[in-house]
């Protein structure tokens, strides 16, 4: 049974990544005309790109657009084009979008240090200092959500608002079968996938791919629990998961309650933090439903977050 689950998880990753590399005509049907045009455009060119020397890494980054800065943090095994190619143009219409490839991912070569959420959060902090950005909104997806949580805990002075898409702040925030699958996944499951092909095409030695997969997976086989620290984050938090996600509902609800949720807003006022459970959406499918999610994110980031609820 476990083997069956793991194989299905691997297939889902490959299929979803392949889909993310293709134009999403079906997905863009529900978006506004403006977003349709953006999503169907050719990828826009960065205003700035390069490598930042941070904590021993040469961290690859790209910057798009103008306005309030938002940093997008990718998921495991991903890179800028795989995770964000259809999303950057939409956010860049009104924001300065900073995207980077974290330790060992994409064009950021690995170094001999522990692969950890804490280290990668410190790298993001260093990148913002390199770019001379005092503070930013942070959006993290999956593994990037864990990095975003740690960024909020370790570098609160650099954070304005926090957006978590399908991320966890403790290891048992995943459904048990998902958590169990991490220990038995391996490089063979990605054979011939866009993940393997992009790893090779971005200047990495193909012989190192199995070691890369093992190191990335190491972050999820070690127990972690930042519940206390995360619940004390002062910045407003928007957490979104799919209703068929790998993240447990109660995990997201626990944080939302700690941030003032779980009460009727018409009586007690609206909390500054927000929660969304996206219907008909898997963990990987979150990236295919960004036409629903981006308007929610923009509203959260642009709102004055006053507690007064709307009236008739």
Predicted regions located by residue number:
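Conserved HGGG/HGGXW glycine-rich cap/lid loop of the alpha/beta-hydrolase fold
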Residues: 57-109
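Conserved alpha/beta-hydrolase "acid-adjacent" motif
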Residues: 246-254, 286
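Short beta-strand/loop motif that positions the catalytic acidic residue
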Residues: 233, 239-241
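Active-site nucleophile elbow and catalytic-triad environment of alpha/beta-hydrolase enzymes
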Residues: 213-229
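Active-site loop/oxyanion-hole signature of alpha/beta-hydrolase fold enzymes
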Residues: 99-139
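Flexible "cap/lid" loop of the alpha/beta hydrolase fold
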Residues: 146-154, 160-196
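Catalytic active-site module of serine/aspartate enzymes centered on a nucleophile-bearing elbow/loop
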Residues: 271-312
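C-terminal motif of bacterial Sec signal peptides marking the signal peptidase cleavage site
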Residues: 17-20
């Amino acid at each position: 049974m476990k083997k069956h689950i793991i194989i299905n998880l691997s297939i889902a990753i490959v299929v979803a990544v392949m889909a993310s590399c293709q134009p999403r005509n079906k997905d863009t049907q529900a978006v506004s005309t403006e977003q349709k045009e953006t999503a169907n455009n050719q990828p826009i060119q960065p205003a700035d790109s390069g490598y930042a020397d941070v904590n021993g890494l040469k961290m690859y980054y790209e910057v798009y657009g103008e306005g309030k800065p938002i940093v997008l943090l990718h998921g495991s095994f991903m890179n800028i084009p795989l995770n964000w190619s259809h999303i950057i143009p939409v956010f860049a219409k009104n924001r300065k979008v900073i995207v980077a490839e974290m330790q060992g991912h994409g064009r950021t070569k690995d170094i001999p240090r522990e692969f950890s959420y804490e280290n990668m959060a410190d790298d993001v902090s260093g990148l913002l200092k390199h770019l001379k950005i005092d503070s930013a909104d942070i959006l993290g997806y999956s593994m990037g959500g864990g990095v975003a949580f740690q960024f909020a805990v370790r570098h609160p002075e650099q954070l304005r608002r926090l957006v978590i898409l399908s991320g966890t702040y403790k290891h048992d925030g995943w459904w048990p079968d998902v958590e169990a699958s991490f220990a038995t996944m391996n490089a063979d499951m990605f054979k011939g996938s866009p993940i393997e092909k992009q790893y090779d095409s971005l200047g990495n030695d193909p012989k190192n791919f199995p070691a890369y997969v093992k190191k990335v997976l190491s972050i999820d086989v070690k127990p972690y629990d930042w519940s206390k620290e995360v619940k004390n984050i002062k910045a407003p938090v928007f957490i979104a998961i799919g209703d068929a996600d790998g993240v447990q509902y109660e995990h997201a609800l626990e944080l939302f309650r700690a941030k003032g949720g779980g009460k009727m807003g018409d009586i007690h006022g609206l909390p500054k933090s927000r929660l969304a459970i996206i219907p008909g959406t898997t963990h990987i499918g979150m990236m295919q439903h960004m036409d629903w999610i981006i308007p929610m994110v923009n509203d959260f980031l642009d709102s004055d977050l006053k507690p007064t609820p709307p009236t008739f």
